[in-house]
Amino acid sequence: MGKIIGIDLGTTNSCVAVMDGDKPRVLENAEGARTTPSIIAYTDKETLVGQPAKRQAITNPKNTLFAIKRLIGRRFTDNEVQRDIEIMPFEIAKADNGDAWVNVKGDKLAPPQISAEVLKKMKKTAEDFLGEPVTEAVITVPAYFNDAQRQATKDAGRIAGLEVKRIINEPTAAALAYGLDSKKENQIIAVYDLGGGTFDISIIEIDNFDGEQTFEVRATNGDTHLGGEDFDNRVINYLVEEFQKEQGVDLRNDPMAMQRVKEAAEKAKIELSSAQETEVNLPYITADATGPKHLNIKVTRAKLEALVEDLVSRSLEPLKTALADAGLSVSEINDVILVGGQTRMPLVQKKVADFFGKEPRKDVNPDEAVAIGAAVQGGVLAGDVTDVLLLDVTPLSLGIETMGGVMTSLIEKNTTIPTKKSQVFSTAEDNQSAVTIHVLQGERKRAADNKSLGQFNLEGINPAPRGMPQIEVTFDIDANGIINVSAKDKNTGKEQQIKIQASSGLSDEEVEQMVRDAEANAESDRQFEELVQTRNQADSIAHATRKQISEAGDALTAEDKAKIETALAELETAAKGEDKAEIEAKIEAVIKASEPLMQAAQAKAQTNQAGEQQSSAKDDSVVDAEFEEVKENK
């Protein structure tokens, strides 16, 4: 069995590692670097990846692709994609299935197809080191990646010729890397992962017992559209605006000039992590009728921090949510680990230290920790590492739409995966022959406020009164966080299932918005839930009353029946509205109008009871006739 390599497929940079004996080793690429820029360039003759692609970007901006991870598993209509369209020099296009793809030299390319080029380079780097073919890998993704994005990442691996043995979350992988060198018995760590395009926070408990380590994720949260690229864009916009003020020329219309500004902005941002001031000097950036123009702008660390302070602050809200979900206070966190190149920024380190009340660890390499952890997990799957157990979680609740437009959760957020959960549901109408299983992901009570992952029908249900058929719905989340849903009629044994497809995943903004909305709208959610319960009560009463009318037959006068029917019609109209009090009033009206129905039912019951007693008395006399003393009286 060959080695299972670990790959950190990053937005800005990627990294590959492998177990070398009992230690993970980060591998150097063909250019001698331990990380590879996640940049792909398509020229007339070849496809370039990494540093060679980056070097020619200025002369080939429309066919040099970067930050493709921000598009993977996304719909073209997502707000984040629309924002990226405005700032990316290459053309983002709408695919036939509605996904966001990229136009390159007249061809539409899917993000997994493009990302596969980076994975191929990682694969080749590992093969050069090991001297043998590599066919299996563990690939990391942001913890807050949804099902669509995880599926798309697996697709990228497959396109690159790799069997993806496991998709694991980046903060969890970093915790594995940290745990290798930590021999403390029990500890709880926070992994703050601010990469090139995504942000994650995970609270992880590490237990050392009898030589074995267990890594259990207690909670995770994040913002999958927040990262170093956003910091770069703030600097780019500042430089472009300052140049326009000075020279009266807008560089945004010149892709080649913008590529130079982008590289200079990234370089300035990095330099300001160690220096208080830097100078961006780009001679001959453009020209007009008066001659060539040169860009020369000084940027201070204070200016940079002012430009990005709100981005850093945005990362603190998920920290609070993750701690609350884990049921922990800041004081219970033993260590804070920083992952991702953007965490080298002093302002980020200060904000994190202020939040946790302790300095983050500096002994974990933020660029390499994730790949190292992926290699460790590869070792676990290959059987080379036997003393490590990893327990990860699903970041959002999963469930189905039930009567009244409510989302009924089967698996709550932060549930350890892999996991499987079943629940029995039934029909909402008499003689219903089919049910639609509508799969949802999110935290809101109202089904429409969550994201639809897909739906399917279970047909061939035997005719029966509503509430009688038993439909068992099962959610199965594998260790990659990928979802399968099935529905089975327990009476007939008929079953249908759906594997959630990549094209139906959530947008990252929707994921974040769901959690924020759930917290901000707890009261409106409660009111909606009460409204639905009242509607369902109205429906049940209407159904039961009509059944009783049918059973009462001639025992109910035409006048009483008309009153009840009028009250029922008013109740059904009210139940379609949003006024809970109105529905409750109409329920009371039906109950009042149904009093003659109750009396008729009671009278009928008494008549039946009297008949039974009379029949019983006759039976008794027949029995007595068999006794000898009765015969003597004759």
UniProtKB/Swiss-Prot annotation:
* Keywords in alphabetical order: ATP-binding, Chaperone, Nucleotide-binding, Phosphoprotein, Stress response
Keyword hit for Transcription: no
On whether Nucleotide-binding is a keyword of this UniProt record, the answer is yes
Q: Which InterPro entries match?
A: ATPase_NBD, Chaperone_DnaK, Heat_shock_70_CS, HSP70_C_sf, HSP70_peptide-bd_sf, Hsp_70_fam
Q: Where is this region: Disordered?
A: 599-634
Q: Which residues carry this modification: Phosphothreonine?
A: T198
A Pfam family annotated for this chain is: HSP70
- What does its record list under induction? By stress conditions e.g. heat shock.
Q: Name one GO molecular function term.
A: ATP binding
Q: Where is the composition biased (Low complexity)?
A: 599-610
The lineage's top-level taxon is: Bacteria
Could you say which protein family the record assigns here?
A: Belongs to the heat shock protein 70 family.
Q: Which NCBIfam families match?
A: PRK00290.1, PRK05183.1, prok_dnaK
According to its UniProt entry, the function of this protein is described as: Acts as a chaperone.
Name of the protein in its database record: Chaperone protein DnaK
According to its UniProt entry, this protein's organism is: Haemophilus ducreyi (strain 35000HP / ATCC 700724)
Q: What is the lineage of its organism?
A: Bacteria, Pseudomonadati, Pseudomonadota, Gammaproteobacteria, Pasteurellales
The protein's gene is named dnaK
